[in-house]
Amino acid sequence: MADYTTIAAQPRNEFGKGFARRLRVAGQVPGVIYGVDVEAPIHFSINRLELHAVLRAHGVNAIIELDIEGEKHLTMIKHVDQNVLTLNADHVDLLAIKRGEKVEVEVPVVLTGETAPGTTLVQDADVVLVEADVLSIPEEITFSVEGLDVDSKVLAGDLAMPANTSLVADAETVIASVNHEEVAEEAEETEGEDAEEAPAAEGEE
């Protein structure tokens, strides 16, 4: 992620649920910038469609240069509150960053390929904690499971780190494991039986 987007934002001097609601109705998302070198949190509002476009293009670790009335702030998305019904962003927290610094972030792990016949792949961890140059945060880390047989495990230490990125997570952290297909089916059946028995038990009470 060597590139970043510059987005114009407006300073925000009013607070409270009512004001935030009016901003959202107007297509804006309230947010705040914080960081070690930020003396006081900087409150702003940003166009929702522009924010969503950045999230779609660069993911949850997106870098944004925020232009607030001509003053530019290089930031990284730290947290986005989503509306549970519309899935629109309701609020965004941005971390002030500097070019050249390193940050710890969780990066999605994408497994590719097919394991050996008669096996099933269980992904135990969807993300892995790494340290990366703030302007070179990988959008994802891929690992091929092609041909892996039963009892094979993919550990965090097995993942190839992109340039300017190092592993922070314990190298022994299990990312994925390969099981017999029958074991996976039995586990699913057990879960289904437990789900059926729970309502029956409640009815007996």
Curated annotation (Swiss-Prot):
This is one of the proteins that binds to the 5S RNA in the ribosome where it forms part of the central protuberance. One of its GO terms (cellular component) is cytosolic large ribosomal subunit. GO terms for molecular function: 5S rRNA binding; structural constituent of ribosome. This is Large ribosomal subunit protein bL25. It comes from the Bacteria. Part of the 50S ribosomal subunit; part of the 5S rRNA/L5/L18/L25 subcomplex. Contacts the 5S rRNA. Binds to the 5S rRNA independently of L5 and L18. PANTHER family: RIBOSOMAL PROTEIN L25/GLN-TRNA SYNTHETASE, ANTI-CODON-BINDING DOMAIN-CONTAINING PROTEIN (PTHR33284), RIBOSOMAL PROTEIN L25_GLN-TRNA SYNTHETASE, ANTI-CODON-BINDING DOMAIN-CONTAINING PROTEIN (PTHR33284:SF1). Residues 183-205 have a biased composition (Acidic residues). It comes from Corynebacterium diphtheriae (strain ATCC 700971 / NCTC 13129 / Biotype gravis). It holds the Pfam family Ribosomal_TL5_C. Disulfide bonds: none annotated. One of its GO terms (biological process) is translation. The gene is rplY.
